[in-house]
């Protein structure tokens, strides 16, 4: 029986993010890197997360913290709701909602991630957390107000 990819693509894992996590292929664009990094969180693959974080972020020394974070977090879903590339094609942005449960408490990360391309490979560099009003539509696309959805 095949397993769907945790990134939410509705494609089998073996045909989707597994090729990136295994190192057989590089993610071709920021959206695929975002999806594969989410899958790495679900699959508890600290090596892939560190490998795809830009070296200037100095996350290699945070390996133990990353692994410790896996123990109490269950990832529930990813929604990518916007993405863009700069005109030179060397910087990309991906806006997403990642839902999770930590120690039984629901949460969501809403971020506009920045990725850079160096030597043909995309890397996560940082992200910003956009602010939403409680009565704004939720960016996840549910049609609900933010306060009744990801803003809880």
UniProtKB/Swiss-Prot annotation:
Highest taxon in the source lineage: Bacteria
Gene3D superfamilies with a match to the protein in the record: 3.10.450.50
InterPro entries cross-referenced by the UniProt entry: NTF2-like_dom_sf (IPR032710), SEC_C_motif (IPR004027), UPF0225 (IPR023006), YchJ-like_M (IPR048469)
Family: Belongs to the UPF0225 family.
Official protein name in the record: UPF0225 protein YchJ
């Amino acid at each position: 029986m095949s397993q769907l990819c945790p990134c939410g693509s509705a494609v089998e894992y073996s045909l989707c993010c597994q090729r990136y996590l295994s190192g057989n292929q590089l993610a071709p664009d920021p959206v695929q890197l975002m999806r594969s990094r989410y899958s790495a969180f679900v699959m508890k693959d600290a090596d892939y997360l560190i490998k795809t974080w830009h070296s200037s972020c100095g996350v290699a020394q945070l390996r133990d913290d990353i692994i410790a974070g896996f123990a109490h977090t269950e990832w529930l879903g990813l929604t990518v709701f916007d993405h863009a590339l700069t005109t030179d094609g060397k910087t990309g942005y991906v806006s997403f909602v990642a839902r999770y449960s930590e120690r039984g408490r629901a949460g969501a990360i809403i971020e506009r991630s920045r990725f850079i391309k160096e030597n043909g490979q995309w890397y996560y560099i940082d992200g910003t957390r956009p602010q939403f009003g409680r009565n704004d539509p939720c960016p996840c696309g549910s049609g609900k107000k933010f306060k009744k959805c990801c803003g809880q």
